[in-house]
Amino acid sequence: MQDPEQFSIESILQRLKERFPTEADEISSFFDWDLVHKFTVFLKEKNEAGGFFSKRDSEEILDRHVLESIYHVYRITKKIGSWKGTQLGDAGTGPGIPGFFFRCLKEHPIVVLIDSQKRKLSHTENFVRSNQIDGVKFQFIRAEESKLSLNYVTSRGFIPYPYSIEAICNLLKINGTYVPFLGKHDMDTNLEKKVLSYSGFKLEFSEDLVPLEFLGMRHIKFLKKVSSPRHGYPRAWKEISKESKGANGKDRID
């Protein structure tokens, strides 16, 4: 569905009720809608300058990026319970999607937006600075080159899953959790087990996000870091990227 002519808190909440009629009230209680509105307007206004979205997505920012992210954040928050004292990183964040929507929670973690490309994320850095928004940090670095010791990491539209596990493995502390945003259940399970093993992770559980079916199949996985990665991992981005191009499972949201 195309975006409303003008974004307002009212138009965003109206679409929220249309898309998630049984959960809208609970979802609305989780978020600071003034901040959601400001960020949504920013995404639209800076889209062309920052090259945030494709031509199709530029007409459906609310459904395909804002509400999709908000629903993911809502479901993850229900599982986590409290974000108090935690740090969450978003790998390959682009302009801050989905990571910034964790900052839009009323009770939010410290959010670290991670991307090696400054073209998109520098606009978000300016947005955060000009609006004096605290609790957001920026890392202009490749995920596999960074060691941040975070509690949680997310990704959406990043390197294809399961190779994204390898790419982010050093971002998390031991017992930290990686929650990739995923599409169809079409990955090679043997490959997934292999990457989980050498990256030091185990699968805790997987959850389908049925209310997002208007966008296609969506699901999330909760992956716990149980040990340091094996020697030699994570590999350089060029190696991970080359191998991932033959992967069946995709982290990209279509």
UniProtKB/Swiss-Prot annotation:
InterPro entries: rRNA_ssu_MeTfrase_G, SAM-dependent_MTases_sf
GO cellular component terms, A-Z: cytosol
GO molecular-function terms, A-Z: rRNA (guanine-N7-)-methyltransferase activity
Residues spanning the membrane: none
Top EC class for this record: transferase
Family per record: Belongs to the methyltransferase superfamily. RNA methyltransferase RsmG family.
Protein's UniProt name: Ribosomal RNA small subunit methyltransferase G
Natural source organism: Leptospira interrogans serogroup Icterohaemorrhagiae serovar Lai (strain 56601)
Phylogenetic placement of the source organism: Bacteria, Pseudomonadati, Spirochaetota, Spirochaetia, Leptospirales
